[in-house]
């Protein structure tokens, strides 16, 4: 993405605006970083990295370095202009204002940035508030300055000059230690950070981003630099897929908006569009993504009409038909004056002008490409027509399910399989997808019949990564799930119509169980993704061990889910205890299954989330796709094989 020209002199103490004081961040951290688990911890990293990215985006600096230090703290260093070091109108050093006052930053006025991705400047102060300590080091105007904060953002030193530097050298380095009294974990994950900064490197093609982990001596450094930017990003997304087209690249500028699009078709059956605004991922899309989809649909339908692939009596194909098998990256720079997000987060762009700008640029250039590449274009239209036929079959299936018009075959699918809940309240009901008939029987007996439904999975679950929609609808197990959930499938899926609040996958704690989990998650990811994104899909966690001692009424019973918990039970029970290793769910009776795995008061559920769409896309493609080599490599790198089954995955 081309960089905006900005006057370096505009980024000074007067450019820092203050909207409100920093209040209650420590009391309600979830309002600012989403959560206090590992996701919230890494959100702190993104806030500081995004500020460094804003500097690079504005044309200042060619490298950003992220370092996980030996003591567990984390540093982000950029080559930007360096934060202003003078006094602010509030009577404090400007740096102190930036790190202690919420919404203090250079992104509200018209001088500091024309485009920015940081959360309107709140990031630095929020990170400071949620840290045990934070240090900022600034290189600017031939000098090096430093200030330290402790105990949730309290300045313990003033901004002081600690050295000199060449006048040509500028930048900011922020180091912080997350507060263990706030976060459930303070362990930074190397791979999580690497994937995120890799994404930023794709979008900043003139900038190198590095990550170093000083906690270990080997395999502790990665560097990312991509000369072709978003084109390289799309190639990365499709790396483990069979592609049908070269990477198409379109760019343009209008009304101060800069647009870049890279897209490529593969032989898969789902689409994967990643959109960004000012280098920040907009996972819920928005007006810019709508413009892209509209442009693709219009250009393709117009071409199909002109070439006779769609006859006069035929209806236009829908956008989802043309997006089947499409991987695309849309990156747009929006001027600060036009930047609007929907809601409190940056997940969805609301800027009205973005839609026509993207639509116009992509429509014109895609139309030209189609006319110049007739054979390829015709193949894409034929592929879309097949997608339409599959979509209409899926819609028919959903309508029949919703209206209760199941065929004899479909009624037979559910007959003797689904044990429904008594309640008809979709906001409270739970559906357990249970591996095998024996476990299904125990689950039926042990459940709370008021709100828990049981669907045993008897046959083989289809690998939907390798199947088209017609094959999916022919698979008995998948078809039964579609009818039971009741919200359609594929492009026609509507999460609001789901019959259950929780879809819970319950399998044995062995390799077969893990395989079934993976097959089901692949199906939900590809064909009911909104169900996952809305947090409705869970994995049940049955215990691995049962330890008992004594008999009759004096019998003591306890369960362990991990080997460390087992060792604790050994110490607690002492000699004379009996240990049972559960090989499968069927070994538990109904009461045990209820107590350990189904009772909302005592069970443990893992909610399935998609934190990084690009990473999830690659993982599904590698593990479930056609290419064996990358799957074998991933297993060798990530799975430890032992002689004794451990139940750890």
Stretches with model-predicted labels:
Residues 54-55, 82-83, 511-512:
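Residues immediately C-terminal
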Residues 26, 83-105:
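Short conserved segment of the HATPase_c
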Residues 58-60, 85-88, 444, 516:
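Conserved ATPase-coupling elements of RecA-like P-loop NTPase cores
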Residues 389-413, 425-430, 441, 445-447, ...:
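C-terminal interaction appendages of subunits in large macromolecular complexes
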Residues 2-14, 22, 46, 54-56, ...:
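GHKL-family ATPase ATP-binding module
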Residues 27-46:
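Conserved short strand/loop->alpha-helix "switch" segment adjacent to the catalytic nucleotide/phosphoryl-transfer site
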